[in-house]
Amino acid sequence: MKILLSNKFYYRRGGDCVCTINLEELLKRKGHEVAIFAMQYPDNIETPWSKYFPGEVKFKPGLGMLEALLRPFGTNEVKRKFTALLDDFCPDIVHLNNIHSQLSPVIAEIAHQKGIKVIWTLHDYKLLCPRYDCLRNGDTICEECFSDKRKVLEYKCMKHSRLASYLSYWESMKWNRERLEVCTDIFICPSRFMAEKMRQGGFDSKKIKTVCNFIDTEKCYGKDYTKRGNYYCFIGRLSPEKGVRTLIEAANALPYKLVVIGGGALAGGVKDRSWE
């Protein structure tokens, strides 16, 4: 089978990137032919498919700011290069991952219009929450945008900025639930919790499947794996939406120590237990 994988970055940057690259390796081992569509970026893995990648955009002041602001809505460069890749590779399936902002869901529409099956693995709550993490201003758990996307404007959830929140609101209006359901055959959620949230957000249950993220057991289980220590271990990015604070608080009531491995905005707070 010919499968086109898409993710905004194509290097081991974060969980979505790691999942995409690991999936590519697994599919190839299973005998499938795989192509990649991502954004141009200096750290990307070298690939012959990069000639189809749209240029890098940076969401900060500069000459490319206008292109960056338009990219979430589907720019001509993305449409042109993605269409060229589809025409040259002729995939049976387009498998999307984290595509918002740098690529945009316009690629799902293009694939659907060509009669190609579209699968979309979700790595956050962007289809439900314009901010993507269901945390109002990065702090308070909030699901109000499930039913009313205007709440992102009311609370200025995007970087406490009215402009950034306005752009996120219009992005969510353009790529609304009805439009995305038409061009996506299956939404894959890595947990039952996310799948339930998608249903609560009004997405068609028939299009929602739960497929947990996988690991390569051969890489995880070494010869000395039986030598276990008396501790729990968290490995991942140390940011508010990961629930690290809650985990550390819960660990105080557990019999073993907690080992935390990772970096991010909360790294300093994890070390000295200060969160401000």
Question: Where on the chain are the PLM-derived regions?
Answer:
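Membrane-proximal helix-turn-helix segments that form the acceptor-binding/catalytic region
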Residues: 113, 126, 142-187, 196
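Carbohydrate-associated surface elements
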Residues: 40, 193, 214
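Short donor-sugar binding/catalytic loops of nucleotide-sugar-dependent glycosyltransferases
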Residues: 9-11, 214, 235-239, 264-265
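N-terminal subdomain of nucleotide-sugar transferases
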Residues: 1-43, 87-89, 113-117, 249-252
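A conserved catalytic-core segment of Leloir-type glycosyltransferases
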Residues: 29-93
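Nucleotide-activated donor-binding/catalytic signature segment of Leloir-type glycosyltransferases, i.e.
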Residues: 260-262, 267-276
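Acidic anion/phosphate-binding donor-loop and adjacent secondary structure
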Residues: 199-200, 205-210, 214-230
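Conserved donor-binding/catalytic core segment of Leloir-type glycosyltransferases
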Residues: 188, 224-242, 248-255, 259
